[in-house]
Design a protein with these regions (language model features):
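NAD(P)-dependent short-chain dehydrogenase/reductase
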Residues: 111-121, 142, 146-219, 232-234, ...
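Generic recognition of short, well-ordered alpha-helical segments
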Residues: 23, 48-49, 72, 82, ...
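Short alpha-helical
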Residues: 20, 65, 172, 235-236
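C-terminal substrate-binding subdomain of Rossmann-fold SDR/epimerase-dehydratase oxidoreductases
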Residues: 3, 186-317
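N-terminal Rossmann-like NAD(P)+-binding domain of SDR-like oxidoreductases, especially those catalyzing
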Residues: 1-167, 284, 299-300, 306-317
């Protein structure tokens, strides 16, 4: 939102505020640069009216949470099949020039992500039959990518899909791993809980880099090509937790909750296609991004309020 406004765009936002916070964009709404519609895009007529006179649609709406939500609530993410199809069809009917879709690393085969001993980087061409996506959330994202490509071919709808890898940063919520770790450090949790054995590998990608890549995709991709937006920095969960505690100035023992959802063991993007097509590469590595995110989180909350709601927040939307 901030980046689009800085580029001079006039923006219309649709959000049912089931997980978002209006205060994040309130200043832009007050300035008149953003028009806000509080509604569910799945309700009759909402998507059609929202897209009137719009040139580019950034479709980020989804029923989604973190790993706890994705694993424990399959029906919710499955409903994204309907949501995505509706948005794409109404974009065509409204004469929208391009749809930029927020896809996910969850489209990649589970079978490629099981061994932490392998230094593997997921490439766009790895998504191919026989498909093996991650949960209903991943299957819905995959089908949306394929639908957009088909709509480009048949209806000449401009399209691009951005496969986001473990996004984090200010304005994030506690059901995602990095914010969850920050919340645990913030309230002084001891023992400090980690889902799984802590050896899972991720390439956490800072939100500002994701925003830049998404806008570049809108500018440079037309045919529905999907690109990875993620760092190639390999970070173990246990190391991220240790760094979080270090930045918070706290010490704690670790308690590994091996029965909790953990996702794939080894998920890291190859971002060479984004570099080639978009001229994009991440600027904020994990250490700096974590520090920025912790500064934001610690300044905005009271420990007693977070502690009271933490367990619910970890698995909710």
């Amino acid at each position: 939102m901030d980046a689009l406004i800085a580029r001079g765009a006039h923006v219309r936002v649709v959000d049912d505020l089931s997980s978002g916070r209006l205060e994040n964009i309130q200043a832009h709404v007050n300035s008149g640069r953003v028009s806000f519609i509080e509604a569910d895009l799945r309700e009759p007529g909402v998507a059609r009216s929202a897209m009137k006179d719009i040139q580019v649609v950034f479709h980020l709406a989804a029923d989604h949470g973190g790993r706890g939500y994705v694993d424990l609530h399959q029906a919710g993410p499955a409903s994204n099949l309907f949501l995505d199809g509706l948005v794409f069809w109404e974009a065509i009917k409204a004469g929208v020039e391009k749809v930029v879709y927020a896809s996910s690393g969850c489209v990649y085969p589970n079978s490629m992500q099981t061994d932490t001993a392998r230094e593997i980087y997921l490439k766009e061409q790895d998504v191919k039959p026989p498909h093996d996506a991650d949960n209903m959330y991943g299957w819905a994202k995959l089908m949306a990518e394929l639908t957009l490509q088909a709509y480009h071919k048949e209806y000449e709808l401009g399209a691009a899909s951005c496969r986001y890898f473990t996004v984090y940063g200010p304005r994030g919520v506690e059901n995602h791993a990095v914010i969850a770790m920050i919340a645990r450090a913030f309230v002084g949790q001891n023992p400090f809980e980690i889902w799984g054995d802590g050896q899972q590998i991720r390439n956490w990608t800072y939100v500002d880099d994701i925003v830049d890549g998404t806008i570049l995709a809108a500018e440079k991709i037309q045919d529905g090509t999907a690109v990875n937006l993620g760092t190639m920095e390999r970070v173990r969960v246990i190391d991220a937790a240790k760094l979080t505690l270090e930045f918070a100035g706290r010490k704690a023992d670790f308690k590994f909750l091996r029965q909790m959802p953990t996702g794939p063991a080894n998920r890291v993007a190859d971002n060479s296609l984004a570099k080639k097509l978009l001229g994009w590469e991440p600027k904020v590595m994990f250490r700096e991004g974590l520090r920025r995110t912790m500064d934001w989180y610690f300044a905005d909350r009271k420990p007693e309020q977070v502690k009271e709601r933490l367990e619910t927040m970890l698995t909710a939307r």
